[in-house]
Structure formats: structure tokens, C-alpha cells
């Protein structure tokens, strides 16, 4: 189900003109849709960044404008937090029609130095700065995390991901 929904959303993004290295913002409450978005964006060859919906609107606006985001993927109850953004198309994740697209794996080729995701620093020395991470960097991080993920399978150690904010990598 996860893969089919991610594939369908990725085809929607591709048909909407998303290309490798485009940046798409994800603003969701912690949910299954957050994971669908991350995977779909990567499958479309684009890069994602998560914005915590509890952030103040000015901070969110700064992130979205600074990153030159083309799309914001969000949920119905959060649309008021992104309605002020010019040149930004919202895709409401609560509408099931977005999962009616082709659910096969898209045929997109990415390069090792293409963007995969973006995070922002805390801004402790001024304005937060965007840090762009590449496909090869993501692959290396996942490879390095495999032993940790194996360890976390034991008992209730697997809950670590549920206590971090989604913008945290």
C-alpha cells in the first residue's frame, strides 16, 4: 500500500512538471502521508524538505521562499498555513484522487549529485541556512544506519523515530 500510494503521488508530481533537483515542501502532521510524500518525491527525482506545522508562519514562509519551493504537500487542516505563498501549488493529501494515478514505479533516473532533501539549521547565528543533501549522501546515510535500524528492531527501541521532529534528519 505504501509503495502504491508513493508511486501514484510521484506520477502526479511528474505530470505536474516536477524535475530532478526541484524542491518540494512537506507540511504534514506526523502521519502515514508524511512517509508517502518523502518516498514519492524521491521517486519523482525531486528533493523534499519537511516543515513542522507548529512553526510560526513567518518562519515557515522564510523556509518556503528561501528554498524556492515549487509545491507544498499538505493536509486540509494545515492549508491556512501555506495559503499566503505566491507561485506555490498546494496538493491536498486528504483528497484520495491523488492516489488514482499510475501506481507502478516511475522510470526516473537520478544522478549521485542530484538533491535528495533539504534541512535548515537552527539559525542560532542569524537566519537559518538551508543545507542541501545529495542522492549519494542519502544512500550513504541509509547504508550507515542499517546496523542501527537492525538494533532498533529489538523490543521497544524502535520508537526513536517517533520522538523527533520530521524536519530533523
Region annotations inferred by a language model:
Residues 157:
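Glycine-rich phosphate-binding loops of NTPases
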Residues 160:
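Short loop->beta-strand "edge-of-pocket" segments that line small-molecule binding or catalytic clefts
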Residues 1-139, 149-153:
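Carrier-protein-dependent adenylate-forming modules in NRPS/ANL systems
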Residues 163:
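Catalytic "switch" loops of ABC-type ATPases
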Amino acid at each position: 500500500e505504501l509503495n502504491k500510494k508513493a508511486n501514484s503521488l510521484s506520477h502526479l508530481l511528474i505530470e505536474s512538471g516536477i524535475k530532478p533537483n526541484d524542491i518540494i515542501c512537506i507540511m504534514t502532521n506526523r502521519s502515514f502521508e508524511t512517509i508517502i510524500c518523502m518516498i514519492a518525491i524521491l521517486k519523482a527525482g525531486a528533493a523534499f524538505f519537511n516543515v513542522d506545522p507548529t512553526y510560526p508562519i513567518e518562519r515557515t514562509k522564510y523556509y518556503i521562499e528561501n528554498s524556492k519551493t515549487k509545491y507544498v504537500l499538505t493536509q486540509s487542516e494545515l492549508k491556512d498555513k501555506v495559503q499566503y505563498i505566491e507561485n506555490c501549488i498546494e496538493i491536498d493529501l486528504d483528497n484520495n484522487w491523488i492516489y488514482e494515478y499510475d501506481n507502478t514505479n516511475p522510470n526516473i533516473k537520478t544522478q549521485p549529485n542530484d538533491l535528495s532533501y533539504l534541512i535548515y539549521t537552527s539559525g542560532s547565528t542569524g537566519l537559518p541556512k538551508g543545507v542541501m543533501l545529495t542522492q549519494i549522501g542519502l544512500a550513504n546515510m541509509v547504508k550507515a544506519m542499517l546496523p542501527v535500524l537492525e538494533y532498533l528492531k529489538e523490543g521497544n527501541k524502535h520508537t526513536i523515530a517517533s520522538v523527533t521532529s520530521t524536519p530533523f534528519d
